[in-house]
Amino acid sequence: MEDGIRNVDVERFARDVAATLADRRGWTGDGRWRLQRVGRDDPADFTVLLTTPVTRGRLCGDPSDRYTSCRNGDQVVINVARWVYGVPHVTDLSRYRQYLLNHEVGHRLGRGHERCPRAGGPAPVMVQQTLGLHGCTPNPWPLVGGEPLAGPSGQYDDPIPAGDR
């Protein structure tokens, strides 16, 4: 967690990350992936970072975007503003946080953005749910009913909200 972030419990953040990535509905649930937490000084395939919106802009290569999170190389960058406040169209903050982690880790695992496959159905985790649902319902998990949920490849032309809240 970046120095200077206040009112976020670093231990709880770490527990939430570990629980989300170990959940049977997550990327490891169908046995295709194995994820393991390692120590601070041990080699890692990727690192989950909780950053301020300004640092997110720098690490993600787009200083004008202080709203979204990203994956850049082996860094999964979680914007603390999204972690704390979520987004207006997803009312369950815990589920939104699970989505946020699974979506950005999905990029690290090689997955691209997807579109909503069926109005009224759950959104694949690789839909940019931070920006909109496009007829789908919020869904934080790569697996639904034990099966991978995917939509057509691509993304919507949603505007990125201004500001960092």
Predicted segment positions?
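Metalloprotease/metallohydrolase-associated module, dominated by Zn2+-dependent proteases
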Residues: D65-R66, V76, W83-V87, R115-R165
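Acidic/histidine-rich, surface-exposed loop or edge segments in extracytoplasmic proteins
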Residues: M1-N7
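Structured segments of extracytoplasmic/periplasmic soluble domains
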Residues: A19-T28, R108, G112, Q129-G132
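Metzincin-family zinc-dependent endopeptidase catalytic domain
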Residues: E11-Y96
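Active-site recognition of the HExxH zinc-binding catalytic motif
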Residues: S94-G112
